[in-house]
Amino acid sequence: ILHSGENVNILVLDTEGYSNTGGQQSKSTPFGASMKFAIGGKNSAKKDLGMIAMMSGAYVAQIAMGANQAQAIRAFREAASFNGPSIILAYAPCIAHGFALQNGPEHQMQMVQTGAWPLFRFDPRLIDEGHNPLTMDSSVDNPMPLEDFLKTESRFGAARAANPQFNKLVDLAKANNAYKSELKKHIAQFAMLNKPVVKENGEAELWYLLHI
C-alpha cells in the first residue's frame, strides 16, 4: 500500500506485541521485553516500521497522544492533507506491559523522554520546498535513563529475573535507539538528494545518489 501511490491513510496502534491473542512477542516487541515465547527477554531489536515507510515516499508520523497531543493532532491533519499514502504510528499501551494503565499519559511521556518512542513527522512535500522532510518533535539530547523507565513495567522486570544477561540487553537497546535516531536523519537527507528531476517532456526521472 505504501508504495502504491494511492491516497490512503493508515493508522497503526502499536502495542509492541500480539495483544489480541494473549501477549506473545512480535517483531514490534522491543529489546529485553518479556512476552510469551520470549520469557527471558527479546534478544533482537524492534522492527522500525516508521523507518521502512520513510523509504517509500509516504507521509510518516510517530505519535504518543499522552505525551504530546498537539503533535498528534498536527500529524493527523498533515496525513489527511497529503495526496498519497500516509501512515501514523501511535503508541498503544497494553495490559501486557505490566503498569497501571490509569497512569498512561505520564507513562507515555516517560517513554518519549527515554528515546524509546521518539516523536517525529516525515513530510515528503517539504522536499519540493527545499526543506528537510523530517521533523523530530521530541528531543533526546538529555534523555531520561532507560533503566529507570524499564523498572516501571513488569514485562522488563520478569526478563531481568529470568535472564542474567539482561543488563546487556539494556545496553543494546540504548545503542539501538541512538543508532535509529541517526539513521532517520540520514534517510531524510537521502530523500532530499534523490528527489525526482522533471524532464522537458514533463516526465519525472528519479536519480539515486549513493554515498559509498
Regions found by a protein language model. Name each.
Residues 1-14:
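A short alpha/beta connector and helix-capping loop motif
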Residues 10, 60-62, 87, 119:
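Conserved beta-strand scaffold positions in the cores of enzyme catalytic domains, especially
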Residues 12, 64-65, 90-92:
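Active-site proximal loops enriched in glycine and acidic residues that flank catalytic Cys/His/Asp
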Residues 15-20, 95-97:
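Short gly/pro/ser/thr-enriched loop/turn and capping motifs at secondary-structure boundaries
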Residues 19-29:
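Glycine-rich, charge-decorated loop segments at or immediately adjacent to ligand/cofactor-binding or catalytic sites
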Residues 27-82, 151-156:
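Conserved thiamine diphosphate
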Residues 72-171, 184, 200-204, 209:
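Glycine/aspartate-rich loop-and-adjacent alpha/beta segment that forms the canonical ThDP
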Residues 174-196, 202:
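Short, amphipathic C-terminal "tail helix"
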